A protein has these predicted regions:
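Acidic, metal-coordinating catalytic segment for phosphate/diphosphate chemistry
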Residues: 23-64
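Unchanged
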Residues: 94-179, 183-184, 188-190, 200-206
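Conserved Nudix-box catalytic region and its N-terminal flanking loop in Nudix hydrolases
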Residues: 68-110
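Conserved hydrophobic/aromatic beta-strand scaffold that supports enzyme active sites
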Residues: 25, 45, 66, 75, ...
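Short, positively charged and aromatic/hydrophobic N-terminal segments
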Residues: 10-11, 17-19
Length: 206
């Protein structure tokens, strides 16, 4: 396992997404909620003023993979915000009732019309400012069959030298692709971990 230093977000227009979650009403009884620290807790939570329900908000999980076919990597150019027009790997939010690997395969089919075989864990990226955890797997694309799904402008199999680094949508994708290529060149499969926080002002080395 390899742990990298925390990264800053330096891609123009790359804002936290989704927006911070703000609650006004209880989803159990419809009464107003108030942000406060409940008794016995240490963090502020939205608490219903009527029924007393405490609404816990936890990080969302984004799952993706790096599909490879005969040495080339499958990339998608986003058709939706955030970062419309920029390139990424197939990825999206984990749904209830599915595993991480199932989510990675589903996103590949939805965004790239590609049926992939999901392999080993590649990276885990804590995106603190967006309240998200991004998980990426290695994957193989058995046949060069793919296309642009509803959320993609175009999809392409590219050689490593053709990756449009300046137009990669998200820092987590950039980190993951670079670690993937490093591992491939070294003939290894490692797990990589890092933290991204746009609130940090320093740019770490390494």
């Amino acid at each position: 396992m390899r742990f990298a230093p925390a990264l800053t977000v330096d891609k123009p227009g790359c804002r936290p997404y989704p927006r911070p979650r703000i609650m006004k009403f209880c989803n159990q009884c419809g009464a107003p909620v108030r942000l406060r620290v409940p008794e016995g807790d240490t963090l502020p939570r939205y608490v219903c003023e009527a029924c007393g329900t405490i609404h816990y908000q936890n990080p969302r999980v984004v799952v993706g993979c790096v599909p490879e076919h005969e040495g080339r990597i499958l990339l998608c150019r986003r058709a939706i915000e955030p970062r419309r027009g920029y390139w990424t790997v197939p990825a999206g939010f984990l749904e209830n009732g599915e595993t991480l690997q199932q989510a990675a395969a589903r996103e590949s089919l939805e965004e790239a019309l590609a049926e992939v075989a999901v392999g080993s864990l590649l990276s885990v990226v804590h995106v603190l400012h967006a309240e998200q955890v991004h998980v990426f797997f290695r994957a193989s694309l058995p046949a060069a069959r793919y296309g642009a799904g509803a959320e993609s402008l175009e999809v392409a199999l590219v050689e490593p030298a053709q990756i449009p680094w300046a137009d990669i949508a998200f820092p987590s994708t950039d980190f993951t692709l670079r670690r993937y290529l490093e591992d491939r060149a070294a003939g290894r499969e490692q797990h990589h971990f890092t933290t991204i926080d746009r609130r940090l002002r320093r740019t770490p080395q390494g």
